[in-house]
Structures are given as C-alpha cells and as structure tokens.
C-alpha cells in the first residue's frame, strides 16, 4: 500500500483497524496481507493510502531481452481482455535499468505481443482510466510486477472542485489530522482553510465515513474480469 513519506505508521494503524494481516512498514509504503474482499474494503476506507498494489510476479532480469521474456510469460489474459485497455507505471532504481519509461515500454510490448500471439488482437493503451493499470518496480536485477487495484491515486476523493490553486493533498491532510491526535469530540478549526481540505477530511474522520465513497472515477478493480 503506497503512501506519503512520514505517514507509514499512520497507515499501518489504519490497516490494522481494517483487518489486514502481516503488516510491515517500508519507505512510503506499508505491506500487508488480505483477501480480494479486503482489497475492495481498503480502497474504500483508507484515508492515508495513495494506491493499493497487488503483487503477482517477481523475477530477476539482467538485460532488456530477459525483461521482455519474463513479462511475456505472465498470463495477462487472466487480468484484462484483448479488447480492453492497459497502462504501465514503472519505477527504476539501480545501475542496470536506469529509465523507468523504457521499462514501461518493454512491459507494454510484451503484453501486447502475448495477446497478438494468442488472440490475433491486442489491448490498447489508455493512460488515464485503463481497464488494467500495471505497476512495475525495479531494484537492480529484481522486478516486482503488481496490479494497481486503485486505478487512479486515492487522494482523488471526488469532492474537490477543479481549478483550486495549490490545493493541499487529501492524503496529506488526513495524515496531518491523525498525527495531531485531535479529539473528535472537540471542535475543529482551520483559520486558513483555502479549499477546505482539512475541514472535509476532519469531517470524514469525525463521523467515521469512508473517505473514498464519493470517487467519481471509481476504482481500478471495478474494471477487472473477476469483479
């Protein structure tokens, strides 16, 4: 589960309350175990999460050919149809693969080539709202391939009016409130409210409301074949 730096312990507490197991904090992320129903629940209820990724494959690659071959072996047809849409996000950390965009392109090529060989047709690329968003994390030779169950970042709650200048990130606001140890029975005052993000997030917290209940674009998992 991805989050902002400094909010890992806060997110771990939320995950524990939501029933997740085997919780372990990392850097800008918290790892846990849950079932598919839990994935749905976490996307809806977590206030300090940015994305919820489901790892499906780990492997090692020394070069672009090995990377392509390993990606092509993944049974992508389980996760998206040949008539669907995909997007690939990648993070590169290390000396072997230095460009995340290149990893994303090789992954995309492997996915569409697998579909062509199996079905003679391929998914199209859709950057904003794909049926399947693929996340690839690289550290030196090691790769972790995950499915992004959130779709778009979970800070996009759905209540903000477009056009506000320098708005406060909703996940950051929710984390600030929890770190402040605010007593929910006391009044909450924001004298420099701007777009009102702190007040809205405080309202969600005080009334124990699911912060992502009103997301306009929904969640990535809602476009998966098994949903």
Label each region the model flagged:
Residues 87, 144-146, 190:
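A structural signal for short, well-ordered beta-strand segments and their strand-loop junctions
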Residues 134-150:
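C-terminal edge-of-domain segments
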Residues 38, 94, 142, 151, ...:
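Short loop/turn segments at secondary-structure transitions that flank enzyme active sites
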Residues 1-130:
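Non-catalytic nucleic-acid substrate-recognition regions in nucleic-acid-modifying enzymes
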Residues 121-139, 194-196:
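Positively charged, low-complexity, intrinsically disordered RNA-binding extensions
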Residues 168-227:
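Conserved S-adenosyl-L-methionine
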Residues 27, 147-149, 192:
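Glycine-rich, histidine-containing beta strand-loop boundary motifs that form or position
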Residues 145-179:
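SAM-dependent Rossmann-like transferase core, predominantly class I methyltransferases
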């Amino acid at each position: 589960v991805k989050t902002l730096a400094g909010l890992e312990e806060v997110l771990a507490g939320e995950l524990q309350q939501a029933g997740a197991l085997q919780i372990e904090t990392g850097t800008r992320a918290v790892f846990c175990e849950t079932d598919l129903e839990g994935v749905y629940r976490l996307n809806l209820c977590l206030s300090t999460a940015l994305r919820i990724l489901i790892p499906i494959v780990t492997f090692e690659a020394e070069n672009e050919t090995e990377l392509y071959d390993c990606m092509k072996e993944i049974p992508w047809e389980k996760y998206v149809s040949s008539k669907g849409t995909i997007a690939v996000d990648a993070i590169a950390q290390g000396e072997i693969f230095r460009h995340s965009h290149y990893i994303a392109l090789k992954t995309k090529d492997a996915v569409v080539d697998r579909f062509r060989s199996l079905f003679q047709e391929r998914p199209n690329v859709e950057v904003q709202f794909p049926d399947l968003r693929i996340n690839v994390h690289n550290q030196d030779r090691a790769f972790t391939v995950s499915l992004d169950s959130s779709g778009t970042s979970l800070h996009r709650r759905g209540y903000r009016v477009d056009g506000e200048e320098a708005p406060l990130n909703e996940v950051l606001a929710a984390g600030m409130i929890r770190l402040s140890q605010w007593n929910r029975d006391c009044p909450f005052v924001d004298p420099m409210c701007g777009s009102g993000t702190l007040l809205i997030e405080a309202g969600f917290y005080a009334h124990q409301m699911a912060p992502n209940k009103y997301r306009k674009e929904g969640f990535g998992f809602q476009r998966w074949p098994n949903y």
